[in-house]
Design a protein with these regions (language model features):
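Short amphipathic alpha-helix that is part of the acyltransferase structural core
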Residues: 1-75, 82, 89, 155-195, ...
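Short loop/turn motifs at secondary-structure junctions and domain boundaries
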Residues: 48-55, 201-206, 360-362
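A short, internal acetyl-CoA/4′-phosphopantetheine-binding micro-motif in the GNAT/acyltransferase core
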Residues: 90-100, 232-243
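Conserved acetyl-CoA pyrophosphate-binding loop and the N-cap/start of the following alpha-helix
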Residues: 99-111, 244-248
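Conserved GNAT acetyl-CoA-binding A-motif
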Residues: 109, 114-128, 258-268
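Active-site/acyl-donor-binding loops of N-acyltransferases
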Residues: 139-159, 236-402
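Amide-forming acyltransferase catalytic core, primarily the GNAT-like/NAT-type
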Residues: 144-236, 243-256, 287-288, 298-311
Length: 402
């Protein structure tokens, strides 16, 4: 008999905080030295986790009274091609080593995704610790993170903007509202609620700064969050609503050239920045970032936008999902007039794919043509071409790690 069948599965409460914290600390090896380096004391990190248990759904597996595995889902909103989706960000996925291999995590994931299905959350995302493991459970890569280093002499010098930059406090209202505006116009971006902002700042040092770019009408149009340490400017995040704000922030970075030797930063636009600067001989490293999974295909398609210029298409998509049975069948979909609906009308084409492939396709990370070339989609090539015609193709911007 599988020992996992004798364990108890339930949602955590605030009384479970000590065990929740201990499991996180052990699994992710957060040491006292690391806490001290970022200004945290053990009792403070425990206290800061109260909102997680209060506002997120944390499902745990107990061996007797002992918490041995957990799976947390943060409720968030996400921009998918300008449609706002209620999604779940899966995090704090961890199990004590002696309990691995018993199917505990798979069972927790099924229960967690089933609860999302009941709550109307049709999409889930996470930052993976093991891409092969999540592949096996129907997840797929949906975004990239590009890290880059720029030497002081390579910082753009021929940029200027008519506005100005001001440093503001971490809790500045304009700063938070600016991110909300950015999220509303950026495919893939998450809307940060109070809990997401708390997690955003959790490990930052006290010397971390926020600089906001304002245009000549005093309207905030961009910001950067950064720390200067050991002659390096570490930029945690830089977003902008337009080219003017982007230039204004680079001008602000250049103003620090006498204080720093290098700039280290990341971009989540999946577009290398070397082309944008005069001296593009820089080091850039690309790696997969977020993974995603459609929780409920039928519900996801209800609000899914498509290209109104792609014409009308009626197609059968045969989806394989070994984890969630309500997704494991054929969906007949009509794409027309910028939207899609399930239909009983005769289908022109038929394609077959797994739930992970469908997820990365509809999020825009890969085209149907590329997935077909990789043998991730089965069917006729003309069907693949028509499907690409009706879909938008833009890689999601996902920068949050919760």
């Amino acid at each position: 008999m599988n020992p996992a069948e004798n364990y108890t599965y339930r949602y955590l409460e605030t009384d479970d905080l000590d065990q929740y914290n201990a499991l996180l600390r052990y699994t992710f090896q957060v040491t006292e030295d690391e806490l001290t380096a970022t200004g945290w004391k053990d009792d403070e990190i425990k206290q800061s986790k109260f909102p997680v248990l209060e506002r997120a759904d944390v499902l745990g597996c107990f061996d007797g009274e002992n918490l041995v595995s957990q799976f947390a889902v943060y409720p968030l909103k996400m921009n998918i091609y300008d449609a706002v989706y209620h999604v779940g960000f899966v995090t704090s996925v961890c199990t004590y080593p002696e309990y691995t291999g018993n199917g505990i995590m798979k069972r927790l994931m099924i229960q967690g995704l089933t609860q999302m299905h009941k709550e109307g959350k049709s999409f889930a995302l996470l930052y993976p610790y093991s891409i092969p493991l999540y592949h096996h459970l129907g997840w797929e890569i949906i975004s990239n993170k590009i890290s880059y280093n720029i030497k002081d002499r390579q910082i753009p010098t021929k940029v200027s903007a008519p506005g100005y930059v001001r440093r503001v406090a971490w809790d500045n209202t304009e700063f938070h509202e600016l991110h909300s505006h950015f999220a509303s116009i950026t495919h893939g971006c998450l809307f940060r609620n109070a809990l997401a902002w708390e997690e955003y700042w959790r490990w930052d040092e006290d010397d971390t700064n926020v600089a906001v770019y304002y245009n000549v009408k005093d309207k905030p149009c961009g910001y950067m969050v950064y720390l200067i340490k050991n002659d390096i400017m570490h930029i945690k995040e830089m977003i902008y609503l337009n080219r003017e704000a982007q230039k204004g922030l680079w001008e602000y970075i250049h103003a620090h050239d006498s204080m720093i030797d290098e700039v280290h930063s990341n971009t989540y636009f999946s577009e290398p920045i070397a082309f944008e600067i005069d001296d593009g001989d820089i080091k850039e490293t690309i790696r997969p970032y977020a993974m995603g999974r459609i929780v409920d295909v039928a519900s996801f398609l209800e609000d899914y936008p498509c290209d109104p210029d792609g014409g009308e298409l009626c197609i059968d998509l045969e989806i394989e999902d070994d984890l969630l049975p309500w997704n494991d069948h054929t969906f007949r979909i009509r794409f027309a007039d910028g939207g899609c609906t399930l239909t009983d009308a005769p289908a022109e084409y038929h394609l077959k794919m797994g739930i992970g492939t469908l997820s990365t396709l509809l999020l825009g990370y890969k085209t149907a043509e590329r997935l077909f070339e990789l043998e991730r989609i089965e069917g006729r090539e003309d069907a693949v071409e028509r499907l690409d015609d009706v879909l938008f193709h833009k890689i999601p911007y996902i920068s949050d790690y919760i």
